[in-house]
């Protein structure tokens, strides 16, 4: 009998372009990114914060190593907090594109390992 693939559909992902947009343009919405040396990005979400994010949230090569270690075959990459609902027109569109483009790129590079979940 063939082994069924193990698929993780709860695989949050923060593409570099998404984080840069958040850092550069999120301030007027109370959003931002602070880069802590040797720890990774910390997201400012209004009064709260999230992070520092583990490197595998942003680095797909590290994520693949982690997936192999825990024997997960496929990650359905998805966005999580702060989402994009808070962002106005142009910024919201740019954030969506950054996320969707990064998920598509990940799938093209590793079609058997990553799918996008928008």
Each PLM stretch: what is its role?
Residues 1-118:
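Helix-coil boundary/capping segments in enzymes
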